[in-house]
UniProtKB/Swiss-Prot annotation:
Known function: This enzyme scavenges exogenous and endogenous cytidine and 2'-deoxycytidine for UMP synthesis.
Record PANTHER family: CYTIDINE DEAMINASE
Domain of life of the native organism: Bacteria
InterPro entries named among the record's database cross-references: APOBEC/CMP_deaminase_Zn-bd, CMP_dCMP_dom, Cyd/dCyd_deaminase_Zn-bd, Cyt/Deoxycyt_deaminase, Cyt_deam_dimer, Cytidine_deaminase-like, Cytidine_deaminase_bacteria
EC number(s) given by UniProt: 3.5.4.5
Domain called CMP/dCMP-type deaminase: residue spans: 48-168, 186-294
Gene Ontology process terms (BP): cytidine deamination
Designated name of the protein: Cytidine deaminase
GO molecular function terms noted in the UniProt entry: cytidine deaminase activity; identical protein binding; zinc ion binding
Binding residues annotated for substrate, in chain numbering: N89, M90, E91
Length: 294
């Protein structure tokens, strides 16, 4: 079991501990539960889906990286496939506060970058901030997404974001988590190709500036993140954050990164290079390359 889970795991009910122990035994537990695993946990504990998600939130929050605030937020995004995806907030010392990742963004990106097609619900241990409510409004589940908070009745996103502004106001038809492929040729080594493939999946209807980041760890594992724009612009999630979300949730740490590649257009209206390289250097990675999409 990864050390970060030990304290939260010890506080779970005995029957949930017993059912989870073989799942968490792998140091690189992927921070997700398949539909089959969810069903097994429900049977072992007698909990319904909502109660189980709440019970698992401490494990999601244990994935938080909060050296600045020490305020850990956990989220679980429930995919329509039946898979549940953990997420947690992340802060980066030496970078800017704008690089921060919120727990809801983490769980949603985890689902999206894992190939999930849509979300049915999201469970969070603290009420979503306005930034996250706006981020969620970019999803193809839209204002119907169910939000579950401890001690409250579940409500749809529309209840948390009245008079919402979103992609439909800008006549955007393709939404976040819809399948997209921008068709750029995969060239170069495996890491470059992973970055280009991530750029091909970008959701960037506002700037038309595709980008993707791929991180290579010392053991050869590669984590890729795609750019995810938002109708309100500021809640946009850069591609580096997507890759860092996966790296963190899958049990790796920043010193594990040995090389990074950013893929983007040289003449795009928005450029990720400066922010990407600055944040990576703050995290200790100095082997950073840029490949141009063609």
């Amino acid at each position: 079991m990864h050390p970060r889970f030990q304290t939260a795991f010890a506080q779970l009910a005995d029957n949930l501990q017993s059912a989870l122990e073989p799942i968490l035994a792998d140091k690189y537990f992927p921070a997700l539960l398949t539909g089959e695993q969810v069903s097994s946990l429900k049977s072992a504990t007698g909990l319904d889906e909502d109660a189980l998600a709440f019970a698992l939130l401490p494990l999601a929050a244990a994935c938080a990286r909060t050296p600045l605030s020490n305020f850990n937020v956990g989220a679980i995004a429930r995919g329509v496939s039946g898979t549940w995806y953990f997420g947690a907030n992340m802060e980066f010392i030496g970078a800017t506060m704008q690089q921060t990742v919120h727990a809801e963004q983490s769980a949603i990106s985890h689902a999206w970058l894992s190939g999930e097609k849509a979300l049915a619900a999201i469970t969070v241990n603290y009420t979503p901030c306005g930034h996250c409510r706006q981020f969620m409004n970019e999803l193809n589940s839209g204002l119907d997404l169910r939000i579950h908070l401890p001690g409250r009745e579940a409500h749809a996103l529309r209840d948390y974001l009245p008079d919402a502004f979103g992609p439909k106001d800008l006549e955007i038809k393709t939404l976040l988590m819809d399948e997209q492929d921008h068709g750029y040729a995969l060239t170069g080594d495996a890491l470059s190709q992973a970055a280009i493939a991530a750029a091909n999946r970008s959701h960037m209807p506002y700037s038309k500036s595709p980008s993707g980041v791929a991180l290579e760890c010392k053991d050869g594992r590669i984590f890729s993140g795609s750019y995810a724009e938002n109708a309100a612009f500021n809640p946009t999630l850069p591609p580096l954050q997507g890759a860092l979300i996966l790296l963190n949730l899958k049990g790796y740490d920043y010193p594990d990164i040995q090389r990074a590649v950013l893929a983007e257009n040289a003449d795009a209206p928005l450029i990720q290079w400066d922010a990407t390289s600055a944040t990576l250097k703050a995290l200790g990675c100095h082997s950073i390359d840029r490949v141009l999409l063609a």
